[in-house]
Design a protein with these regions (language model features):
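N-terminal Sec-pathway targeting helices
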Residues: 2-16
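Mature, Sec-exported extracytoplasmic domains of Gram-positive
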Residues: 25-172
Length: 172
């Protein structure tokens, strides 16, 4: 009788561990992330937050030109291109102006949406800019520039001025 109980307990623990792993993986892939959550996460950023603190929260620093291709960014682009859930957090500090962005792949409309916040000056940029999942990479003098093509947001009928977004640069 004791042996059966022990096996049962062990099986329960294994099941719990697997659930934990699944949850962690889904969180990493952006499952359950919504535009509202992305927006609120940015609005909740402290006015005195630093680049280092954003990096600690999982934001990728894309200031300037990176020394190599970033795997997390490439994975995000690949997932969005293959209609898989994807979320990407970026930060940069160009001209001493700290910026935080959350990009989210929207499966319903098959596009990438972006939310942008400048926490130090507590300024948010018009939320939910839309981009095509066909990401453009151009190589010039050994520097690869990865650009998102801005597309019309199908849920907002207003004609907006489309502006492509440079995601990041890296040296080949």
């Amino acid at each position: 009788y004791m042996g059966k109980k022990r096996i049962y307990v062990a099986l329960c623990l294994i099941a719990l561990a697997m659930l934990g792993i699944c949850f962690f993986y889904l969180k990493k892939t952006g499952w359950g992330m919504t535009g509202d959550k992305a927006w609120n996460e940015l609005l909740d950023l402290d006015k005195n937050i630093t680049l280092e603190q954003l990096e600690a929260k999982g934001y990728i620093n894309v200031t300037g030109c990176l020394d190599e291709e970033n795997e997390t960014i490439s994975e995000f682009i690949d997932n969005a291109g293959n209609r898989r859930p994807a979320v990407l957090r970026l930060t940069s500090n160009e001209n001493d102006d700290l910026c935080a962005k959350i990009l989210l792949y929207d499966k319903d409309y098959n596009f990438i949406q972006m939310w942008t916040m400048y926490p130090n000056r507590q300024q948010a940029v018009a939320p939910g800019k839309c981009f095509s999942t066909d990401v453009v990479s151009s190589d010039k003098d050994g520097v690869v520039t990865v650009t998102l093509k801005n597309i019309q947001n199908p849920t907002v009928p207003t004609e907006e001025i489309l502006q492509d977004e440079m995601l990041y640069k890296w040296k080949k």
